[in-house]
């Protein structure tokens, strides 16, 4: 019997040792959890500014509404009040108010202070408010894709908000408090407090005024050209700063279309970075730069355009099917002659052409600090046939993002590689001091761009300022392959000042449907709008040596044969783009009687 009693006491001693010594810490923590509550203190996200210090995104205090069902005296009263004040479904609230098997349940996040105050004043049993942090965008939809937005729990979802989320979000804090068995806080019992650390502030490279100038032009495109999308950007050629960047349509960052995820996703994308397209004639800037650098051509070099070239037995047409005739390289660039650029690409050959594509960054991501960048689509060099190379010369059979194209163009017209960036550095060094072409080639390309811009006349000419430019028109392709008939992307690249560019812009019009689609008529006029307003904002003085253009009156050519119309245009110094089979003129743009600059390229439809 004594042995049995001794064994029992021994077992109890071992059990007591296990409880007190081995499991003591664990049990202490469990007990502590039962009578303490940890309250998260949400860290304010850092503020986002533009390069001038204008606020683009800022955090402010809102409130989260919770209910502790065990403390609710009248579920109907509480559910009625909250559903009315918060504009949410009564049944949903009532169901949550009845959940007595949990300590508390969330009713709504991010309630504005005014509404939270009304809830507080009603002294509803079991209803509690906790401070939260929400995001506010003072400019609504300005730079919406670039800035991006956060989720309801303050996590960056798109744009800068997502890309730099780790910097912006800060570190949440916590307060640990005593509570009773129902989870109710015991007043004055704060155990300890960890302060929230605010996120870092960011300064973006964009200038809000330039951004507004760009977006105004894009909005005009959407309205006047009835386009599917309109995109554009302004870049500092000297250092790669993105001064403005946008795609329309867009949405107000304070009123997200969360109920339509397709719209939310599509309009959140920075298409200039994510979407590839066939650039068309704007790509000719790269082809001519490579050919000039290799000494394969000169501004006085002669080319003949019959309206087509036959390559590998395949007929490839120039956009001007009746041909441009004999022309110098300077004239061919101004005419945007496809035949000339087929010749230049073939002179380069596949090996050299691809060497320059690599130098210009084609087929590679630029590394810009925006999520979702595409690398473009460059045919494997080993697969390129002669006919493919000919088409590449004028911007077909190759796909890239607009940011890739502008990265390449800026490295050519500025003479050095640039670091594209969305973040602003006050003392950022100009470019990388890494040349991709010689200074002489840069000079010649800028001359070509100034000449081409002058040829578009009325549509891009800004009196008193030397602007360079190149237009482009490219057909779109179906996802399944093959040309998507009647669908085009019209574009314009502009530079200023033409001889030594500081600024470069691009305007893209996706699927214009107002009756015309040529880049010179659809995209270039909005490039002019951007430059005009940019010069006013920058207080840019007019240049004494800028080109002064003579005015002429547009004649009535409707009903004439194409041949007679061309004779009339030649008499007064106008050029034309021709749409149709070359018969009788049925439509002209601009209409008869319009005062336009001599040298303007007009549209004739036959």
Predicted segments — roles?
Residues 65-67, 492-493, 501-517, 604:
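Short, well-ordered beta-strand elements
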Residues 540-582:
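Glycine-rich loop/hinge motif
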Residues 413, 453, 528-535, 539:
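Short amphipathic alpha-helical signal-transduction/dimerization elements
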Residues 1-256, 276, 351-361, 462, ...:
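Periplasmic/cell-envelope proteins involved in peptidoglycan metabolism and beta-lactam response
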Residues 57, 180-191, 232, 237-281, ...:
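Beta-lactam-recognizing serine transpeptidase/beta-lactamase-like catalytic domain environment
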Residues 596-606:
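Conserved "repeat-terminator" motif of extracellular CCP/Sushi domains
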């Amino acid at each position: 019997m004594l042995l049995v009693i001794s064994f029992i006491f021994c077992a109890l001693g071992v059990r007591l040792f296990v409880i007190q010594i081995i499991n003591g810490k664990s049990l202490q923590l469990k007990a502590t959890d039962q009578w303490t509550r940890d309250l998260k203190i949400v860290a304010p996200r850092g503020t986002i500014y533009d390069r001038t210090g204008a606020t683009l995104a800022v955090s402010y205090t809102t409130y989260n509404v919770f209910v502790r069902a065990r403390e609710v005296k009248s579920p109907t009263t509480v559910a009625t009040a909250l559903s009315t004040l918060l504009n949410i479904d009564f049944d949903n609230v009532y169901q949550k108010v009845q959940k007595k098997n949990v300590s508390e349940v969330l009713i709504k996040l991010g309630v504005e202070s005014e509404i939270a105050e009304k809830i507080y004043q009603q002294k509803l049993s079991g209803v509690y408010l906790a401070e939260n942090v929400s995001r506010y965008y003072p400019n609504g939809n300005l730079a919406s894709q670039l800035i991006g937005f956060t989720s309801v729990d303050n996590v960056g979802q798109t744009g800068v908000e997502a890309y730099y989320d780790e910097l912006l979000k800060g570190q949440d804090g916590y307060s640990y408090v005593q509570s009773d068995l129902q989870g109710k806080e015991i007043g004055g019992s704060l155990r300890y407090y960890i302060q929230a650390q605010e996120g870092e502030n960011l300064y973006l490279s964009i200038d809000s005024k330039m951004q507004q100038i760009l977006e105004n032009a894009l909005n005009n495109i959407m309205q006047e050209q009835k386009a599917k999308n309109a995109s554009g950007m302004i870049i500092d050629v000297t250092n790669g700063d993105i001064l403005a960047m946008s795609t329309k349509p867009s949405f107000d960052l304070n009123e997200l279309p969360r109920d339509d995820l397709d719209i939310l996703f599509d309009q959140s994308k920075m298409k200039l970075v994510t979407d590839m397209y066939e650039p068309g004639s704007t790509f000719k800037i790269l082809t001519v730069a490579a050919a000039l650098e290799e000494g394969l051509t000169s501004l006085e070099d002669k080319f003949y355009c019959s309206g087509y070239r036959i390559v590998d037995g395949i007929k490839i047409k120039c956009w001007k099917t009746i041909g441009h005739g004999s022309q110098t390289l300077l004239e061919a660039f101004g005419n945007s002659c496809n035949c000339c650029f087929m010749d230049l690409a073939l002179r380069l050959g596949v090996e050299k052409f691809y060497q320059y594509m690599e130098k210009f960054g084609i087929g590679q991501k630029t590394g810009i600090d925006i999520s979702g960048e595409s690398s473009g689509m460059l045919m494997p060099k080993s697969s390129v046939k002669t006919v493919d190379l000919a088409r590449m010369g004028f911007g077909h059979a190759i796909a890239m993002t607009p940011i890739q194209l502008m990265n390449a163009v800026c490295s050519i017209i500025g003479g050095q590689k640039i670091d594209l960036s969305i973040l602003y550095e006050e003392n950022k060094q100009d470019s990388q001091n890494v040349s991709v072409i010689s200074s002489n080639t840069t000079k010649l390309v800028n001359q070509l761009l100034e000449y081409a811009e002058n040829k578009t006349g009325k549509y891009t000419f800004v009196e008193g300022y030397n602007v360079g430019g190149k237009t482009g028109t490219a057909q779109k392709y179906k996802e399944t392959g093959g040309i998507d008939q009647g669908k085009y992307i019209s574009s314009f690249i502009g530079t200023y000042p033409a001889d030594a560019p500081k600024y470069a812009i691009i305007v893209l019009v996706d699927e214009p449907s107002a009756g015309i689609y040529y880049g010179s008529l659809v995209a270039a006029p909005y490039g002019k709008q951007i430059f005009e307003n940019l010069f006013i904002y920058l207080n840019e003085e007019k240049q004494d040596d800028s080109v002064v253009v003579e005015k002429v009156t547009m004649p009535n050519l409707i009903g004439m044969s194409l041949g007679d119309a061309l004779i009339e245009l030649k008499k007064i110094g106008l050029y034309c783009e021709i749409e149709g089979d070359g018969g009788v003129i049925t439509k002209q743009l601009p209409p008869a009687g319009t005062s336009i600059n001599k040298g303007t390229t007009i549209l004739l439809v036959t």
